[in-house]
Amino acid sequence: MTKNISRRDFIGSIAAATAATALTSCSTISTPRRPAGLRATQNAKVQIGCIGVGWQGGANLDAFLGISDCRVLAIADVDASHLNDAVNKVNARYQDKGCAAYKDFRELITRADLDAVCISTPDHWHSIPAIAAANAGKDIFCEKPLSHTLNEGIAMVEAVQRNGRIWQTGSWQRSQNFFRWAAELVQNGYLGKVTRVEVGLPSGHADFGGTGNTKPNGEPPAGVDYDFWIGPAQMMPFNPCRFHKNWRWNYNTGGGQLMDWIGHHCDIAHWGLASPQFGCGPDDAVGPSEVSATAEFPAKDAVWNTATKFHIECKYPNAVNVVIAGGYGEIKGGTKWIGPQGWVHVDRGHIAASNPEWIKEIQAQEKSGNLKIRLYKSPGHAQEFVDSVKSRKRTLTPVEVAHRSQTPGHLGYIASVVGRTLKWNAAKQQIIGDAEATKLLSKTMRAPWHL
């Protein structure tokens, strides 16, 4: 780890800034402000630093490199091979050698010439860089799920609101036509009052890293600062099966299929429910009042120990029931809203409705401008973030929305662990009358890391 910035001093400054304001309800929205000295203007290129440039981080880097009105100035990654490859890619794109390389993300965040950061680290490394970036006056693009624990998400929302930052989550489905059309169908009342939503997620474990789950512990690859990679998670021996890409299958660093996908399909479910007619609350405050769940888990000490199958039932206000399931064939992958007048189902590359003519009507009305409730049509997920950094307008997936979208996943996991139904106060963001479950809203971070 780099020595020119004190880890303890840096973290202390984050903690002091975070403690300056008590945590607030995520339903409180503040208008993003432009602090004095922010470099970006309507005519300037937005200058970005990328933290984490592995699998998804590499894809996000490519997206920003393809945008003419932004410039990637710096890369941070604890894996030297990822870092070097990304820096070379940036320099080749701009045909110069201007991209700075850092192992320590804290050095990147302190740069005064950066307007924004893109955080594409594993789940356990979202909250600390995000809060630090917000406190440093940076706007933030961050991967989903928003946070490794629910309480980390609350702290992230508070930091972004207090500092008036623009935030975009990597829940890119909101920037796609099929998902927008489906949510518009629901919000425009084609189904009547929605009574049930089915959210189908993948199950099991996908071997994205190509390692399988039976390799023995060993030494980390050359050029990897494994202590820094583990960071606030609990120290575990290095094992290639729970490293790049496959870290998501161990609860120390990820949240399994449930949390890997909750920020996609449950996010879309909430988007459809965000109309006042359903009584579930606005998009940035919607949430369940009761959650019950069952799940199948490998052994706790297994290399991959996240749930392989899960079924979560959530009661929302105004008699709306939301089912989130993985491994149950009757719950089709994607998002399906059901009401007395019919249903609509959407997944990647697919939209269907009980009345196919509805889809044609929505498309025609959207085109003509006659749609009563018209949702924002994104120019592209990364482009919209860049545009919002300049305009200071909220994005499609601000931090408040991301937090509410992931909440049923966190609560569903907790309910499956304690084995009982949870009562949830969505306004106060507290579990009611269950001390054991409440403890699972957060994790102890490995010293010296803390929020």
Predicted feature locations:
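N-terminal Rossmann-like dinucleotide-binding module
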Residues: A17-Y94, Q173-Q176, A269
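Rossmann-like dinucleotide-binding domain that binds NAD(P)(H)
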Residues: E219, D227-P317
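Beta-strand-loop-alpha-helix segment that lines the small-molecule cofactor/substrate pocket
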Residues: P122-D123, S127-S175, G189, G419
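N-terminal secretory signal peptides and thylakoid transit peptides that target proteins
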Residues: M1-T18
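C-terminal helical cap and adjacent loop that interface with cofactors, partners, or active-site loops
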Residues: S13-A17, R33-P35, A59, P237-P240, ...
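A structured beta-alpha segment of the ubiquitous adenosine-cofactor-binding alpha/beta core
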Residues: Y94, G98-I119
